[in-house]
Amino acid sequence: MKKEIGGYFELEDFGGKEYYPNLYKVNLGRTALRWLLEGRGYTKIYLPVFLCESVTEACEQRGIRISRYQLDAELNVLLPRKKLGESECLYLVNYYGQLTDEKILAYQKIFGNIIVDHTHAFFQKPLPGVDTLYSCRKFLGVSDGAYLSTDAELEPEKKPLDHSMGRKIGRAHV
């Protein structure tokens, strides 16, 4: 383990090895989300009420309609159990590792289009056919970085930019 510096870990050197070498690599989780929303052509997303503002902002920047859903005491989705429309998706956050692979697959079977946010479950591997986002900063001593697992056809030249220094000097708007 690295030596702590003022409550933070120093930046890590991984010797050029990626934890998820076969996934898309982007600078931030919200960048991965915007890229995925564009690639899938979603026009509406169901977001939990307990959520980081940056996710909401990323959806708004893409012009995605947002509908909020409640969670029960065990962080289960409280929505009518039905397939979503082709251009709609459900955003699932794995807050404390409560989303097992079985539960994720059950949500996919019920709702169809889902996006799993493993920001707080970095080491839980992505499932085939399930769009999954990871943010490296929550678990690793890196300044930025995120992974995206998807089988969607994504166009690299359309990758949205995200100016992460906006966190330091106020919000940067893309």
What residue ranges belong to the model's regions?
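Conserved small/polar residues in nucleotide/adenosyl-binding loops
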Residues: 172-174
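Alpha-helix C-terminal capping/helix-to-coil transition sites in glycosyltransferase folds
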Residues: 86, 128-129
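Intramembrane catalytic core of multi-pass membrane enzymes that act on lipidic substrates
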Residues: 116, 123-126
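Active-site PLP attachment segment
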Residues: 129-168
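A cross-domain feature marking catalytic cores of carbohydrate-active enzymes
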Residues: 116-118, 136
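PLP-dependent aminotransferase-like
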Residues: 5-19, 23, 27, 31-109, ...
